[in-house]
A protein has these predicted regions:
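N-terminal helix-loop segment corresponding to the beta1-alpha1 unit
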Residues: 1-122
Length: 122
């Protein structure tokens, strides 16, 4: 999809509503959004109501690419950092401090990519 944000890459590690909704708006404006989901089921919103792709999940994650990576795994964390290195925006809505404990907080990711816009929604 083309739009004013064509050429902008977003890494979305959000779940449920707020993070995915913010990333969805950017995708609607043309950004390439890569949704990072945990192994073992991904975004909990997937299974609401009608199985793997419930209507809420489809609505909030339309136009996104998806990849399964575990932020607790060193190798997968390196892959997340590589995504961030090549991206413009990082959106997360985890509990405060959760990604910092895993080495994926704003300070660390801005060291990987100094021009990164880091959006933390709580």
């Amino acid at each position: 999809m083309s739009g004013p944000l064509t050429g902008v890459r977003v890494v979305d590690v959000g779940s449920f509503i707020t993070g995915p909704f913010a990333a969805m708006l950017l995708a609607d404006l043309g950004a390439e959004v890569i949704k990072v989901e945990r192994p073992g089921g991904g975004d909990p919103f997937r299974s609401f109501e009608r199985g793997l792709y419930g209507p809420q999940f489809r609505a909030f994650n339309r136009s996104k690419k998806s990849i399964v990576l575990d932020p607790d795994d060193d190798g997968d964390r390196s892959l997340i950092e590589e995504l961030v290195r090549r991206s413009d925006v990082f959106i997360q809505n985890t509990r405060p401090g959760a990604l910092e404990k895993r080495g994926l907080g704003a300070e660390r990711l801005r060291a990987v990519n100094p021009r990164l816009v880091y959006c933390a929604i709580t």
